[in-house]
Amino acid sequence: RSSLLRRFQLFFVMTSFLRAVLPQTLCARFESWRKNGASTPSLLVNGLLLTLLLVIFPLEREPFGTLRSRLRDYYPQINPECPRLLDSLRIIIQSFWLLFVKPGRPSGAEAVEKVLAGLRAAGRIINRVGELWGNFCLSIIRRVKPLSEASNAGDSGEVNDRTQFSFGEKTLIVIAVILGLILAAICITQPFNLQGQVVFLTFMFFSMIALARIRARISLMLLFVISIVVSGRYLWWRCTSTVNSDTALDLFFSCALLLAELYAFAVMVLGYFQVCWVLDRKPYPLPANRKVWPTVDIFIPTYNESLDVIKPTVYAALNLDWPADKLRVYLLDDGSRDAFKAFADEVGAGYIKREEHNHAKAGNINHAMTVTDGEFIVIFDCDHVPSCDFLLSTMGWLVKDPKIALVQTPHHFYSPDPFEKNMHLDRRLPIENSLFHDFIQKGNDTWNATMFCGSSAVMRRAALNEVGGIAVETVTEDAHTSLKLNRRGWSSAFIDRAVASGLSTETLSAHIGQRIRWARGMIQIFRLDNPLFGRGLTLPQRLCFFNAMLHFLHGLPRLIFLVAPLPYMFADIYIIYATAASIFAYVIPHMVHSAVTNQMLQRGYRYPFLSGVYETILSWYILIPTTVALIAPHVGKFNVTAKGGTIDKKYLDWDISKPYLVLIALNLIGLAIGFGKAFFSPNPEFLTLIINLGWIVYNLMILGASMAVAVEEVQTHAFPRVPLSVPVEVEADGVIHQAELVEYSQVEVRIKNLDEALTRLSEGQAVRLHLSDGEHRFTFTAAASVFETKGIRDFTMRFADKTEERNFNRCTFARRGMWATTPDPTIDDRFLTGFVQLWNIAVYGYRSMIEFLPGKTLPALRDGIISFLPKTPSAYKTEA
């Protein structure tokens, strides 16, 4: 009883002290919190924290008054009128995000601006040094003209073919390569102590910074050399000094990571070789006499696609600019559908079907070859729509050089792919396949190893007949066919001009299904017709084809990288047996140099950090098919990629996300264990923990972005809309109004700059649209739709017949230059910007995971977890 009395007296004294010391406004604040529903634990915790803050800071005075008034602006998660128990943690997370992540900032940060100005000045000095060094290097080798910046392929706009060197230039290049390899071997194997390694890498780092600012072949090739040397030293160190063999388990994990790193190094070096001298080939002009132009057969294979999907392609093929007596369009229907035959007959296309449906698409094309006789064959997937200048852009090289068997053009898509759509990427950013179709193929062309991609290509019939038609031994018949053609001595070419565009896969699951087939097929080729062996190929051709196949074995290495830090967290296994200082001295430079060099190489074709997301999404799903193909290459069948669909509501594809969820759970557990070791271990290894925790955080960012891609966005339009800016005349009630067409699909157009008379049109009211394809003027009937806002209105097309529909296709889909695009130079593709973008995508992915958690009992859990995630303050929004 006396103990209870003493406690009551102590409580009374403390209460009296607080009432005497603390201002009346604080007591009123406590009372306000209580009336607004704050819980007792929240009152105790937040009251104690507020009391401590008042003791340290005079919060009731200026300038803290301004901070108090804007608390909700910068911390949207916090309600000052009704605090929650863990608001302090929310403030810490949001503060960290505002200080170190959020790129924007309120005005008035003069000190920060001064620091940034100093950094920019230092950067300009480094850039100037780099320019002087680069000019000095260029002057040394100025006699080898193709190495200079001015001779970079395609800069002059002239027609380009593979570079031809004189004997002296070849000799100089061979000597330089041999000396370079010897020097690289010495640099890679030369033993340094830790201080020597730091000095060497410092020199390499500043060399990289200087060279990265010079746009010339020589600077890029020197960056390749520096990257290979730095990464080579890292791997030499890994192989000779860091393999942990204390126990069998240690050896297993250590060797697993080392093998994954060796794979990544091999892909990196082969990639550098593949694109070290890209050829920007332009179309070659055709003979002026159109009578000598060759005959061309257009093949459009189809199996189970809808008629609406193939219509634009057939119309565009019929609209190709080519002599009518030398052009024949064929619809190859492996589905044997009467509606398709009737459509082909009505529009004037040929219709071919076969009794036996062997070997899928390859068999379909090979059968069509037996009943046609054109000198050249053009193959379009049924959703790939060519512009009318497709043949004018591609046939010139085939007519000029009788040894060219294949001319391939890049694959572009007019509907957003799952990455672009689900990650809400800017449409100006390069899409997932841009790196290969817009850049690597130009490198392949340099080495006469252009790969047939199954569509948007022209092939010489004589060459196809020589190799037995389209290859049927694997499920990637296109790449295998180009390999066979090169083995027989035929050449290939890649035209760097988008003259066709197709439909992307609508969902992530469809995309993964397509890539599984590609991965299986490429490994089948590796096993059945390995490019490293056999006759007919040059060494560069072998390396280019081998690298294409090696790429699809990234499944296991990528998974290893995603779990590599966990053995240390779970069982104190050192997968890199070295001190933390040595790891910093070797690992970080290896990562920085390879990342910067690849970014310099891929600028305009791949956004920073997204390669890891692309590979992570596919890694689990291609692992088993590629492994099976290595063991049993004849197993597997051709699957048709579904195209042309809608998505009624937004959802998270939990089934496709299961591998990512497992990896997220493992990394989160590892993260928790790591923090536990840091705070509660008697002798924590802080540097080692920092390295592994940083690795885990990066893995979680990649996995969070992967989850974002699995969130399927609504797609209400059955016919994708395509942007196009051309003038249009709208005739209503006998009056012609000038306007601008800004978007179209197969059945609709969107028109802006409408005057008041057109905005008042009733729904369904008929108008006449006058459009030009650049040469001819066409008139179409359309009906006003319900959508109208700010001088913009949709109109539904009402085609009188197939001829009118074909003419509309010529004015839109098949319009000359319709698909031609160039990388946007205004895109900010710096590493910091890319990292922030990756962070934002990952946050969106984790938010979506919580949002789409199944069940009705979890809303509170979702809201609670979401409240801890950082948010953009309203202060930033209003100032923007």
Locations of the language-model features?
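N-terminal membrane-anchoring/stem segments of glycan-assembly enzymes
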Residues: 3-292, 344, 554-558, 681-684, ...
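Cell-envelope/extracellular polymer assembly enzymes that use nucleotide-activated donors
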Residues: 295-297, 328, 480
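Structured alpha-helical
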Residues: 3-14, 650-657, 664-880
